[in-house]
From Swiss-Prot:
Stated name of the protein: Golgi apparatus protein 1
Keywords in alphabetical order: Cytoplasm, Cytoskeleton, Glycoprotein, Golgi apparatus, Membrane, Phosphoprotein, Repeat, Sialic acid, Signal, Transmembrane, Transmembrane helix
GO MF term set: fibroblast growth factor binding
Topological domains, Cytoplasmic: 1148-1160
Region forming the signal peptide: 1-18
Function (record text): Binds fibroblast growth factor and E-selectin (cell-adhesion lectin on endothelial cells mediating the binding of neutrophils).
Any one GO cellular component localisation term in the record: microtubule organizing center
Membrane-crossing segments per the record: 1127-1147
Amino acid sequence: MFRLSAALQLLLLAATGAQNNHGQVQVPGANIGPLLGQAEGGSPAGQQLLQLSQQQKQPPQQQQQQQPAFPAGGPPARRGGAGPGGTGGGWKLAEEESCREDVTRVCPKHTWSNNLAVLECLQDVREPENEISSDCNHLLWNYKLNLTTDPKFESVAREVCKSTISEIKECAEEPVGKGYMVSCLVDHRGNITEYQCHQYITKMTAIIFSDYRLICGFMDDCKNDINLLKCGSIRLGEKDAHSQGEVVSCLEKGLVKEAEEKEPKIQVSELCKKAILRVAELSSDDFHLDRHLYFACRDDRERFCENTQAGEGRVYKCLFNHKFEESMSEKCREALTTRQKLIAQDYKVSYSLAKSCKSDLKKYRCNVENLPRSREARLSYLLMCLESAVHRGRQVSSECQGEMLDYRRMLMEDFSLSPEIILSCRGEIEHHCSGLHRKGRTLHCLMKVIRGEKGNLGMNCQQALQTLIQETDPGADYRIDRALNEACESVIQTACKHIRSGDPMILSCLMEHLYTEKMVEDCEHRLLELQYFISRDWKLDPVLYRKCQGDASRLCHTHGWNETSELMPPGAVFSCLYRHAYRTEEQGRRLSRECRAEVQRILHQRAMDVKLDPALQDKCLIDLGKWCSEKTETGQELECLQDHLDDLAVECRDIVGNLTELESEDIQIEALLMRACEPIIQNFCHDVADNQIDSGDLMECLIQNKHQKDMNEKCAIGVTHFQLVQMKDFRFSYKFKMACKEDVLKLCPNIKKKVDVVICLSTTVRNDTLQEAKEHRVSLKCRKQLRVEELEMTEDIRLEPDLYEACKSDIRGYCSTVQYGNAQIIECLKENKKQLSTRCHQKVFKLQETEMMDPELDYTLMRVCKQMIKRFCPEADSKTMLQCLKQNKNSELMDPKCKQMITKRQITQNTDYRLNPVLRKACKADIPKFCHGILTKAKDDSELEGQVISCLKLRYADQRLSSDCEDQIRIIIQESALDYRLDPQLQLHCSDEIANLCAEEAAAQEQTGQVEECLKVNLLKIRTELCKKEVLNMLKESKADIFVDPVLHTACALDIKHHCAAITPGRGRQMSCLMEALEDKRVRLQPECKKRLNDRIEMWSYAAKVAPADGFSDLAMQVMTSPSKNYILSVISGSICILFLIGLMCGRITKRVTRELKDR
């Protein structure tokens, strides 16, 4: 009977994956009534069938030539009233003595007069309390056998199905009188369009499928297999005859078990396989025809699918949908699973799938003619072939797509429907995932294991899972993955409610909300488990595939959707795409705009988890275990790898480096950082954030606004971390790399670290500037970006690795409570400079020297004085910024904090002339001339504690400096006269005196020269010679110019205006004018001025007496003015005379020689 067409096996395998079918199979009773009704009403098919069933004038007799292999037994004994002499219009089953009691007990009275209705009623009885007697069973068996082989029934079939038979050549050629005609029509039932013929054959099918022995040819094909699998142990006798459906069920289980074993002990023969699958196909529309499943699930059908209309496989689908309900009986669940496994082997076992997709299978050549026999009917191939058409943009009917969705969901829901999973993952399932068989939990458990969260999985199992994910394609519709669907339902309802249900962008939306408050933990796990596989096959992201398939084919040499290349590693195509996504126009071969946007979207989403980057996880697995085993929180693993970049294996380092380089161009890849920085981006960087092409602008903006009030800790830490990573390689700063690439190759070859490149380039720029080179070696665009990088590095000591390494121990010792950032650590080190270790001290000194030459690099000064710079120095050059601020320091509009910071920098400058570039330039001739002795003792990179400046101050008092140097020293003297802290030598030598004699003045918030005045007044109380010398030097300086004596200048300001306005300031001219005015009795000075002048005269007089001689002239003057002048002169004269006398008396010391020897 069953000459299997080649297409059947292909459709079979596909059905294994569908888990949520809603169709149901027609129950025989559903059609019998109408047919009989039509028989009474006059339908030819109905009348003839009814008449035939009633025209059996005698009970069915045993026909030896047609007995099946397992005979039903001898004919029943003739009972009264059942023979030809029976009443009514012919022989009736209900009147047979052997069945009368059973019919009366089981069947409704209105069916008794119709043999087919009685037959249907009795053969569907399975309850123990209603069990049919053995004699009645035997009678029914022979009656059905006669029906299937009776030539009269065949003649009815030929009449009712005349046009159908002419269309189906196979049936027209069947021999007459052997029952093959009806069997052939049953075989082609799906192709019968004639209504009456279809109804007739449906009735006959119900009779034939009630017992495997009635299926023509089935016994011949499966006899040996029945014995081999021991499926024939169910004998007729006391048991229900209709349990013969168990034999077919047993064979089906043997068939699916064989597919799940590597080396099956028992193999079903090919002929029997075809027969089993064909029986399953023919019972696909009416679940009543699968006798084992019908009896196993009859109660469950009433419970779950009571309102489901029978026919076209709807009952099957409804039961599939409820397979994992708690109240589903275990025997029904097992029967449904077996049915689903058969669908996986032959898609035609699913009536609705085969019917809905028939035209599409033919249209896209997914049918028999194109494929090797082993694959043609498998559900997996059908799904892959049709999904490939969908992904290529071809039209597949909505009915077919709906069926595909159901069966893809079915495969994802129950791992046991995929023989490859059972074969390859049996050990892993037993070890890691036992007891998780329902609702897709086992598959997700295996996914979790593969992600490395619970152990390792074999490659075969991993490959089987990857294949299953491709077959089911849950990336196209999240609902296919039931475990994910249930876990993420709440998130979808809140975060993704604006997206249509089933849209592929739902998964994208979930990824965007990963690690947010809206995400729930269970959804997070299920999502990452699925994304792990999607990330390894670019085709599994339908939006990416649709928009990039052209680019992938052109640039990455990809295959079709359902073709794979074993030579291509996981994630290789996507890696290829993102390499081309960030190419410039000059580099060529770029992606289309749509594809580029998709690649960026996925990059942004997947960067949150290293496991979603196959190449990264593969190459860095050892390094992750070695360096980052404790970094388990979100995003920490990649940060950890970046932190240990120099320690990583070469392959891992290259991948991490490339990814970091990519991040520098498009920082939005750092999705967690972007999420943390969202408020700052919205407030300060929305312009650059909206740009489709980032090119490093967004990170630059975040760095510039890192210390805004709105900045949160997570964002600041993230930005700083990225800055620290950038220091490891100049390629990690995209804008710097693009602006200076050529300059680095030319001027700084073989230099990798960013800080070294910055130093190299900035040194070149500085040298060219100092040497006033006609043309800078560093290009203009590079110089501009170099300035940005230099400014960014000043913000955090960690961004200057050499300084940081040199000062680590000092930071722990003196700045342990100070936070990084805002240059706070650097400022702390400056304040504790005297206590620093030698190496750190030298580095800090070098830093200060650089900052004084270029104040814009002084982050703290620029930050504190930002508004004052805008107010007072908007036009000032970066190198003259501090000079400008100093000039406006005493303005009433000057901010106190900025003024304090300027004073700090002045104090620093006055500790060493090298920290004052203006002074250094103005006095470059004077310093070696007058202070050579100090310079010879000085060491590089250590302060001179103001010795050179003190030396120049003394020469200023003697009016011996050059005019430029004199101007600068005058400013320094004026400033230090107002604030003692600006005189390092005074601070150094008079610290005890200030603390003891002038504590109140020193504590004043505003320094206006009170401390200096206090020291002058208390000069006689000072015991320390060095301090006394410093005070005397101050007095000497003030004598040179009134401007350097703020107290005196303030007291005499009006007098200078009235009496000395015409006198040019400088070189003591105005001071001399005031002294003359004091001596002139005609001039009346202000009382305060007069008092201060008299005090100064006394001080100068005392200073002249006690001050040490600076030179020979000073020494001669001191002798001449000394009260012991005569005594000193006498001693000197006597000494000379004694020396002369000794010479006369002792003669020459050298030996006499002749003139000749002298002249020789």
